[in-house]
């Protein structure tokens, strides 16, 4: 699971680290260096994320992996494939750098045969990811890259769905309170939790009679 900044901010800012880790089955939260930088830098301009930065500093080390964005042959190749520019030029475009490096690292690992899930809320980032999923499958069909590798994506609502399924929220009221806090942070989530389908059964268990 490789994360963009937005979804991570929502869980950090609302003290939902246990729910985040439960949602991904105890896997490691992987972030590119550019995302780690954004977690530390964005709160300087957007104070609603200051608490997220503090929580990230205390994030359990065994569940966190900040991966270097230093140039590699595969990252360079992926950058040229996805964006049509060299890596050094991409580095100079600070806007969306975290999101872009998330995609490049994910694609690089998928080419190496790993099963990768990218966590992103930005619609532009999702569109780019969908396009690269199609390209990867086409290359696998042609036999030009390992067939065992895969690339997929999930959004904050997907993570919340998974967290509900594994019983990570104490109650539906607890979930709704946290959701409303997340929705106030930015524009990525619907303001009304009812619009997400996340208060239905499933993902909540059936009512006992």
Annotate each PLM feature.
Residues 1-116, 123-209:
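Active-site-proximal, substrate-binding regions of enzyme catalytic domains
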């Amino acid at each position: 699971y490789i994360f963009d900044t937005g979804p991570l901010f929502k869980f950090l800012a609302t003290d939902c680290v246990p729910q985040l880790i439960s949602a991904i089955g105890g896997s490691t939260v992987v972030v590119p260096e550019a995302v780690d930088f954004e977690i530390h830098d964005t709160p300087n301009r957007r104070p609603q994320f200051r608490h997220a930065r503090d929580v990230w500093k205390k994030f359990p080390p065994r569940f966190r992996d900040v991966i270097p964005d230093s140039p590699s042959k595969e990252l360079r190749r992926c950058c040229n494939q996805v964006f049509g520019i060299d890596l050094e030029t991409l580095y100079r475009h600070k806007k969306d750098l975290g999101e872009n490096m998330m995609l490049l690292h994910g694609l690089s690992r998928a080419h190496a045969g790993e099963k990768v899930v990218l966590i992103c809320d930005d619609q532009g980032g999702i569109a780019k990811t969908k396009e690269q999923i199609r390209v990867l499958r086409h290359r696998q069909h042609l036999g030009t890259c390992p067939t065992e590798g895969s690339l997929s994506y999930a959004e904050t609502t997907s993570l919340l769905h998974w967290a509900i399924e594994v019983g990570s929220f104490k109650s539906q009221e607890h979930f709704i309170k946290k959701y409303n806090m997340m929705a106030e942070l930015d524009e990525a989530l619907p303001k009304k939790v009812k619009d997400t389908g996340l208060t239905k059964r499933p993902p909540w268990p059936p009512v006992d009679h």
